[in-house]
Amino acid sequence: MDPNPRLLILLVLLAFSATVAVAEDGESTGGSKVSLGRRAGGFLHGLKKEAVVEGDHGVALDEVGPGLFDALFASLSMILVSEIGDETFIIAALMAMRHPKSIVLSGALSALYVMTVLSTGLGRIVPNLISRKHTNSAATVLYLFFGLRLLYIAWKSDPKGSQKKEMEEVEEKLESGQGKSTLRRFFGRFCTPIFLEAFILTFLAEWGDRSQIATIALATHKNAIGVAVGASLGHTVCTSLAVIGGSMLASKISQRTVATIGGVLFLGFSVSSYFYPPL
């Protein structure tokens, strides 16, 4: 029996359509695979770029790390040798003998923290107005001046003398200022009088002091955060010692010893600033 021609034609058309459908399905699958491959490649390329950027940041942080700790150590040691036995130290010690230690400590530290932030800010502004080379030269000269001045004080001072005489002078200043209390009474309505007194006396005593000028000089060519943190830690240690046992400590420490250590440290800063200037 001969097959029906119409049936054969129908079978051929069905087979052809199935083949075309399979081919189109394969092309769409392949296209989607190519698209997915491209997307995956782009994603991996982006991850690679991010990894490179993160790696660069990691290197930068590693480079900043030593500078941060170097500035912290320099400012901390500078404050320790400058403030022990200084006028701000003695003010805190004398006030703590007559007033609650916690209030005196909080008032004095508040003033010193504000002064540290101001000094560090000035140290960062100056290089934007003056070239880094000139600011580094100025810092070198300042360190040298303070170092020689402290060594001169150590040479002229009595080797057996203590800080008692300076404590008496500062106490006379405090007593002479008791009558001028109009401003204190005015601010006393808003702040604790003892806190305000400790803040004002410490702030005025620290303004223009060698530790403030040295902090500004350090901030011009060292890491500002390290300088601020180190100076704040140094002030915290010195002021706490003054409040807790300042009178006893000041009477035991020789002025010559403190001045000698401070002079050597500042001379070391001067040599370091001259031979290892910032890039």
From Swiss-Prot:
Domain of life: Eukaryota
Keywords: Membrane, Signal, Transmembrane, Transmembrane helix
A GO biological process held by the record: Golgi calcium ion homeostasis
Signal sequence region: 1-23
Transmembrane segments: 64-84, 103-123, 135-155, 186-206, 224-244, 258-278
Entry GO terms, CC: Golgi apparatus; membrane
Gene Ontology molecular-function annotations: calcium ion transmembrane transporter activity; manganese ion transmembrane transporter activity
Location within or outside the cell: Membrane
Database matches in InterPro entries: GDT1-like
Membrane topology: Multi-pass membrane protein
Family label: Belongs to the GDT1 family.
Protein name: GDT1-like protein 3
Organism of this sequence: Oryza sativa subsp. japonica (Rice)
